Amino acid sequence: MMRQPLTKRPRRSGIIAGPNQHKALFRRCGLPVANRASVGALLMTETNQAEQAPVSRRSAKEWVLVLANYREPSTFRSVFELAATLVPFVMLWGLAWASLSISYWLAFAIALLNGVFLVRIFVIQHDCGHASYFSSRTAQDWVGRCLGVLTLTPYDVWRRTHSIHHSHHGNLDQRGIGDVLTLTVEEYRARSRVGRFLYRMYRNPVVLFVLGPSYLFILQNRLPFGLMNKGWRYWTSAMGTNAVIAIGVGLMIWLGGWMPLLLIYLPTSVIAATIGVWLFYVQHQFEETHWSKTEDWQLHEAALEGSSHYVLPQPLRWFTANIGIHHVHHLYSRIPFYRLPEVLRDNADLAQAQRLTIWESFQSVKLHLWDEKLQKLMSFREARRLYGRV
């Protein structure tokens, strides 16, 4: 199946990379999925009526050539952003510790606030894993490993599994590592009653956003899951990170007892993990995302169509280090996070593409199954309405 160049998204007035994103307009107009000519004519009519700018005809692959112009990091800027994140993080840690002698609740509140700085630390580690943060690979690998101790994430393990996520995202035949488990309607219906129950439990918001983040970062990250038989490098990364974490926690308890661990360290880590999992979820789990079989899957189209542009107010963009500009990041992961706004500034089509508001992101929690026929993510309720018992 040949995919079309970028065109306007009917619902959010952005751009897309292929027919996958026309589904909302297909359904609204009662057109069959295969009738692309009618949809193209309708899109042109709506565009003219709205007096919008001409549609970009760049394909997703052509956008890669444009984005390559933004890949060079600035060493000064990278060091500055790292310092602007670590210094407040350390200061708030110290303030929370000092507050233990005044009020446990005050220390706990400061620890929760510090969680947003830990999110930013994780995104910097994330950029190091993509080799986008410094010109020196050695420098960014060691910065990433050190930050991984703070984020409870073994750097080399995460770098590899995240690379797999980027390489296979949106491919229905390559699920399982570095993504949120997503079943198709047919796969879900084919499962046993126990299997369906377990999937419903997994997709429950309490499991995904309350229990899951703590399990992932505090427990699962202690072993190189997914890479257990892939060599010593990943075991060294996991065990080395664990050893440094254990030394740090031991010193913390020795110096201050259990309260710093229970009221500062764990709350900061848990709130950061929760925010991180939420961000990852909304970056790929939205109604008009992209999934396809290997024979129809194309890397660049899947990157652009299957990743959202999470529209956040400026303070949240800073704390999350622009990770919400995820459609651009997935299309060209070598761009440092602080240069992503430049991309949107210079390319209005990308600025309007794949937009997901905060309100829309809350609605995405209700979506559970991928419908291969309608090419959209849907809720259990909608699947039941369309296909009977699920």
Task: Annotate each language-model stretch with its function.
Residues V87-M91, F117-I121, I271-T274, T320, ...:
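Residue-level signal for transmembrane alpha-helical positions in Major Facilitator Superfamily
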Residues F134-S135, C146:
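Small-residue-rich helix-interface/hinge motifs
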Residues C146-L147, F319:
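Short alpha-helical scaffolding segments that buttress acidic/His motifs in well-ordered protein cores
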Residues V277-W318, T357:
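Membrane-interfacial segments at transmembrane helix termini in multi-pass membrane proteins
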